[in-house]
């Protein structure tokens, strides 16, 4: 049994040499769920006969969702095994959550009608009754939801935690982008564990966390736990209180509305999906934010001995913002092998490049030659355990030697013409033609690359260079 190495890092604080970039095949893309100049249209009073914009078109939603795509290979750790799976992770974290959700700078508290201190109508608002957020697959393949956070919590939940997810990465510990990629058996078949961590911070004040997720849908709500009776300045036997006729106080206690309910709220969440390595379809995910807001109305009514303060209902409305992202499970970033370019050391600027055929770089039989190094997917390869260099132009294309010693990409198989091994900086084909000759990858002139008998190969120095994966 081969030995595996446990290697744990944090993306928040990674100690590397200045200028060095750790090789971690994870692609991150921010998706912004954003809307500005939102109006908050609510009734003006408990008479419910007119409306106005309580936010003066100044409300906004700005939530930054970090979407990370990665491939994990199975590897052993002290905590168990990492999965062999294609993974996508949606995170709103403490590091870059966006500017948050905003209603107004200050709560409005005033009278909608006033006859006397003993007989009047009041209001307070607008404030958020709940903040709803979700991630869900809406079309295409439905992946399995492996984990979601946070869980159900009561109000005043204060917590800061770093949540990690371990993936197995093909290669060796400490590998760096633009440095040498795998060449020999132990490097090719080996893997290390990377702990992909994000920090979530919660300070929910008056809001409880209600996780309503099911199956592959992630659905969470931060719900205001105070009801209308709780928001009164005080309570007596029921949902009311009394005061002297000359009392000038408000029905509702403004101090019970924390700024998180109207000024700014920054949600955090983390949800992770897995797909089998055989999956090649697409999934359209919807990410959304719904801001539910409210204004509360109160009455002060005179009685024989005192005035009665009580709730007189509320007006509610909402604003919803959605975004979509398509995940292509057949994208080359989900391939298992370390991503490298095959760069010539006999030429200042030449990499092995899939030219394709008639403009189609993915077709079987597409030609392979040299080209200036640019690092696009048609120059990226992965050396698998069967000694094959798999092109990233498509999921089943391997570097192949033809009878005329030219190179193409063909459907991957067990043919010796698709097997390669390294001796120093020489990349040698296992292709045989009965002449007992070793054939080396070689520049035969200009940008033309073929395999050449060893004794004729004078531009045959190469290196596999690790590449940072990208969309």
From Swiss-Prot:
GO molecular-function terms, A-Z: carbohydrate binding; toxin activity
Any one Pfam family match given in the protein's UniProt record, by short name: Leukocidin
Signal peptide range in chain numbering: 1-20
GO cellular component, one term: extracellular region
Organism this protein belongs to: Vibrio vulnificus (strain CMCP6)
Record's protein name: Cytolysin
Family to which the UniProt record says this protein belongs: Belongs to the HlyA hemolysin family.
Known function: Bacterial hemolysins are exotoxins that attack blood cell membranes and cause cell rupture by mechanisms not clearly defined.
């Amino acid at each position: 049994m081969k030995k595996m190495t446990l290697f744990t890092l944090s993306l928040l604080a990674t100690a590397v040499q200045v200028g060095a970039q750790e090789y971690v095949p994870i692609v991150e893309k921010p998706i912004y769920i954003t809307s500005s100049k939102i109006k908050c249209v609510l009734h003006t009073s408990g008479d419910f006969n007119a409306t106005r914009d309580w936010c003066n078109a100044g409300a906004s939603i700005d939530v930054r969702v970090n979407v990370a795509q990665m491939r994990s290979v199975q590897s052993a750790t002290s905590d168990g095994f990492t999965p062999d799976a294609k993974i996508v992770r949606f995170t709103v974290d403490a590091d870059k959550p966006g500017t948050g959700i905003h209603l107004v700078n200050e709560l409005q508290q005033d009278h909608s009608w006033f006859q006397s201190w003993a007989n009047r109508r009041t209001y307070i608002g607008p404030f958020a009754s709940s903040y709803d957020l979700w991630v869900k697959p809406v079309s295409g393949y439905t992946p399995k939801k492996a984990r979601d956070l946070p869980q159900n919590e009561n109000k005043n939940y204060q917590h800061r935690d770093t949540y990690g997810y371990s993936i197995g990465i093909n290669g060796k510990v400490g590998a760096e982008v633009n440095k040498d990629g795998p060449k020999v058996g132990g490097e090719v078949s080996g893997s290390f564990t990377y702990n992909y961590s994000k920090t979530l911070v919660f300070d929910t004040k008056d809001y409880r966390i209600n996780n309503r997720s099911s199956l592959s849908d992630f659905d969470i709500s931060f719900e205001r736990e105070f009801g209308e009776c709780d928001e009164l300045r005080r309570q007596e036997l029921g949902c009311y209180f009394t005061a002297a006729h000359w009392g000038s106080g408000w029905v509702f206690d403004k101090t019970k509305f924390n700024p998180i309910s109207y000024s700014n709220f920054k949600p955090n969440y983390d949800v992770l999906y897995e797909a089998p390595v055989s999956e090649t379809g697409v999934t359209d995910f919807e990410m959304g934010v719904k801001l539910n807001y409210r204004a509360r109305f109160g009455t002060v009514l005179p009685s024989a001995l005192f005035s009665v303060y009580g709730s007189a209902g509320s007006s509610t409305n909402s604003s919803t913002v959605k975004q979509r992202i398509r995940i292509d499970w057949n994208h080359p970033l989900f391939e298992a092998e370390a991503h490298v370019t095959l760069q010539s050391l006999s030429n200042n600027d030449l990499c092995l490049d899939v030219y394709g055929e008639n403009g189609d770089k993915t077709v079987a039989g597409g030609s392979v030659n040299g080209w200036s190094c640019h690092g696009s997917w048609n120059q990226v390869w992965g050396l698998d355990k069967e000694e094959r260099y798999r092109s990233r132009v498509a999921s089943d294309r391997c570097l192949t030697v033809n009878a005329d010693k030219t190179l193409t990409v063909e459907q991957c198989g067990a043919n010796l013409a698709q097997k390669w091994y390294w001796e120093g900086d020489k990349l040698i084909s296992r292709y045989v033609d009965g002449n007992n000759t070793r054939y080396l990858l070689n520049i035969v002139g200009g940008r033309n690359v073929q395999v050449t008998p060893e004794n004729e190969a004078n531009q045959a120095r190469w290196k596999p260079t690790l590449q940072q994966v990208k969309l």
